[in-house]
A protein has these predicted regions:
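A solvent-exposed, acidic/Ser-Thr-rich amphipathic alpha-helical stretch
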Residues: 27-85
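Short, flexible active-site loop motifs that bind/organize anionic cofactors or intermediates
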Residues: 15-16, 49, 121
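Hydrophobic pocket/interface hotspot
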Residues: 11, 26, 34, 55, ...
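A beta-strand edge to alpha-helix "cap/lid" segment located at domain peripheries
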Residues: 1-3, 67-145
Length: 145
């Protein structure tokens, strides 16, 4: 598991340095049947995001959807915690929606399930209200008056 943790830390570092444009290091960690899920699927996007994304080709579609709609402003890793078959990444991220130019910033948690040294499941937890606001799906708090 320590090797996976080190490779995961390197993948996040490359992702952050590229501002969300080079997911290749993540692909190297995936099992062929990886399942990518996001809290945003149900709470914000509904069926529009098309998740969960199952398999490496679907994972590519996931990252393509992000690249087409969002620009990473910054991201940082605060901790990577491993226990049994789970690895949890804890950090912060800021993204700008390319259509609305609104930003969403805040804590982010990714939960990875690992078997035989490969990621078989990934769950992303990020600010669903902030994402909906950046997409123009809900009004800014200050605009409600």
């Amino acid at each position: 598991m320590e090797e996976f943790e080190a490779r995961l830390a390197a993948a996040y570092e490359a992702w952050h340095v590229s501002r969300g444009r080079t997911p290749e290091r993540f692909f190297e960690l995936y099992a062929d049947d990886i399942e990518l899920r996001s809290i945003l699927e149900a709470s914000v996007y509904g069926e529009h995001l098309g998740g969960p994304f199952i398999g490496k080709s679907a994972a590519l579609a996931y990252f393509t959807a992000i690249a087409e709609a969002w620009e990473m402003i910054e991201a940082t890793t605060e901790a990577i915690i491993a226990r049994d078959d789970k690895v949890v990444w804890v950090g912060r991220a800021s993204w700008r929606n390319l259509k609305s130019l609104q930003t969403v910033s805040g804590p982010k948690v990714d939960v990875w399930t690992v078997r035989n040294g490969r990621a078989v499941d990934y769950l992303e937890v990020f600010d669903s209200y902030g994402t909906a606001r950046a997409l123009g799906m809900v009004a800014d708090k200050g605009a409600e008056a």
